[in-house]
Regions:
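A structural signal for short hydrophobic beta-strand segments in well-ordered beta-sheet cores
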Residues: 43, 53, 77-79, 216-219
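Buried hydrophobic packing segments
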Residues: 32, 96-106, 133, 188-191, ...
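Short glycine-aspartate micro-motif
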Residues: 61-63, 84, 141-145, 163-165, ...
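N-terminal helical capping/dimerization or prosegment-like subdomains
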Residues: 1-63, 71, 231-235, 249-252, ...
């Protein structure tokens, strides 16, 4: 069957065949480096394992960044009609493959602008790949991240995140006299409920995207049924809308923690920020957004849908670090992420390649117009 596939589908099929859970991206990185070379992109693999292909050109510099890693768990790779199934068939090998194919075609046509295509490592982990790009001061005037937005949609916003570990320690005693002791589980949960009440005037509480949301994700505490717990550790994930900066939230959390400690002097409670990310929203009227939206209409015959998602993506990090127009785009239904039913519609995948090609050409045209004003 594969001998009948076009080169773009063959590339994606092989990428899905190459099992690449986080930490095991070296084989697919070497494969993609060779593919990039064959398409006229100068490839290299950096010190953390990112594969980077470049096409020289003048300003503007455009970054296309996808990720090679997937969540763990092998799935059978199979074709069923116009669908390709397998681990990474949604999250997010089609987006990366589309970027490579689009960049290769543009390079062959002597695209005047500089293009950098990155297959990053560790996106599903701690984000080492993207962090290394930033530490090495990668330059871009526009950036597109490859994640499944849907072929006719462009993600322009993600919420920020703040992941906390709350540790509570108290003196223990016999559970037959609980009134004599502070229960570490109760105390930790009391503080957690106070955190859940933190809100800001800038929020739109009726909106899941424009409000602060919180989830208790883990709780560990207690030792024996006859002992009042003296230790409790809980983990929580809070998501922040663009109107609420991480700094603003942490300041309010600090006030809440200070007030709790003043009223609970015999309870030892510590809060650690395990991971955090600022919210990010792109300008819907930016050259990048307009260029890609134009291409969606041109290829699909429908206006692009601009999405705001309650999750958090790599574009948060780059957009808030480099302060350049940044969006997320890629084929696929994100509801299939990390499931056993990951699959991609190959017609949508092929259309996404054309959308990226036409979109980047439009971005260059709009950029040049803006420079003449």
């Amino acid at each position: 069957m594969r001998s009948c596939l076009n080169p773009q589908v063959k590339l994606l099929h092989r990428m899905v065949e190459l099992y690449s859970p986080t930490g095991q991206e070296s084989e697919i990185a070497q494969f993609l480096a060779e593919e990039m070379r064959s398409l006229g992109l100068r490839p290299r693999v950096d010190e953390v394992g990112n594969v980077i292909g470049e096409h020289s050109g003048e300003a503007p510099a455009i970054l296309l960044c996808g990720h090679m890693d997937t969540v763990p768990g092998r799935l059978p790779v199979r074709m069923d009609g116009e669908r390709l199934y397998g681990r990474g068939a949604v999250d997010a090998k089609p987006a990366l493959a589309a970027m490579i194919c689009a960049a290769g075609t543009l390079a062959a046509e002597n695209f005047p602008a500089k293009l950098t295509v990155v297959g990053a490592v560790d996106e599903e982990g701690k984000g080492r790949g993207l962090r290394n790009l930033i530490e090495k001061s990668i330059h871009a005037d526009y950036a597109v991240f490859g994640e499944p937005s849907g072929v006719e949609s462009i993600t322009i916003a993600y919420k920020g995140s703040c992941r906390l570990k709350i540790t509570c320690r108290t003196k223990t005693g016999h559970s037959s006299a609980p009134w004599l002791f502070h229960n570490a589980i109760d105390e930790a949960l009391e503080f957690w409920r106070k955190l859940q009440k933190i809100h800001f005037p800038q929020e739109k509480r009726e909106s899941k995207f424009h409000s602060v949301t919180s989830a208790l994700t883990q709780i560990h505490g207690g030792g024996a049924s006859s002992i009042v717990p003296s230790l409790c550790e809980i983990h929580a994930d809070l998501r922040l809308p663009p109107a609420v900066s991480l700094k603003k939230f942490l300041e309010e959390m600090g006030k809440t923690l200070k007030a709790y400690r003043l009223s609970h002097s015999d309870v030892n409670l510590e809060v650690e920020v395990e991971d955090s990310c600022e919210p990010y929203e792109a300008d819907r009227d930016s050259i990048l957004t307009r260029g890609l939206a134009w291409a969606v209409r041109n290829v699909r015959g429908k206006p692009a849908t601009l999405l705001r998602k309650t999750g958090t993506g790599d574009m948060n990090v780059l957009g808030t670090t480099l302060h350049v127009p940044t969006v997320t785009y890629g084929p696929g239904n994100s509801r299939l992420d990390h499931t056993e039913d990951e699959c991609i519609d190959l017609n949508e995948y092929m259309d996404s390649i054309r959308i990226l090609q036409k979109g980047l050409m439009r971005v260059l045209e709009l950029h040049r117009r803006s420079m003449r004003k």
